[in-house]
UniProtKB/Swiss-Prot annotation:
The keyword Hydrolase does not apply. This is Profilin. PROSITE patterns: PROFILIN. It is found in: Cytoplasm, Cytoskeleton. Occurs in many kinds of cells as a complex with monomeric actin in a 1:1 ratio. Binds to actin and affects the structure of the cytoskeleton. At high concentrations, profilin prevents the polymerization of actin, whereas it enhances it at low concentrations. Has a high affinity for poly-proline. One of its GO terms (molecular function) is proline-rich region binding. SUPFAM superfamilies: Profilin (actin-binding protein) (SSF55770).
Length: 131
């Protein structure tokens, strides 16, 4: 299965009538493995900030989590494994795997829990595969 198929079939899938606004699988080196059409362009410093927070949980909390220039308030995640952010009625979930970052961005009517489930389910699968 191509990386694009993982994004299209497993991240942009419908859940209870809702789906993510955009999603991507990004290598920890910053390379885009696959993304939805409208996923924002990540800046190198945004990827560095995300990786730093996974290595030292809490480093993004004071400044916020930035994805494509949009600022998200960091909310409770799982230190070293999942970063969650909130912005108005939407937000973002970032799951770290051995080699990649799985990122899902949502807006109402999708709920934070639905976004978490979609992103973390694929992330857990990739971890099981050694990716």
């Amino acid at each position: 299965m191509s990386w694009q198929a993982y994004v299209d079939d497993h991240l942009m899938c419908e859940i209870e009538g809702n789906h993510l606004t955009s999603a991507a699988i990004i290598g920890q080196d910053g390379s885009v493995w696959a993304k939805s059409e409208n996923f924002p362009q990540l800046k190198p410093e945004e990827i560095t900030g995300i990786l730093n927070d996974f290595n030292e949980p809490g480093t993004l909390a004071p400044t916020g989590l930035y994805i494509g220039g949009s600022k998200y308030m960091v909310i409770q995640g799982e230190p070293g494994a999942v970063i969650r952010g909130k912005k108005g009625p939407g937000g973002v979930t970032v799951k770290k795997t051995a080699l990649a970052l799985v990122i899902g961005i949502y807006d109402e009517p999708m709920t934070p829990g639905q976004c978490n489930m979609i992103v973390e389910r694929l992330g857990d699968y990739l971890i099981e595969q050694g990716l």
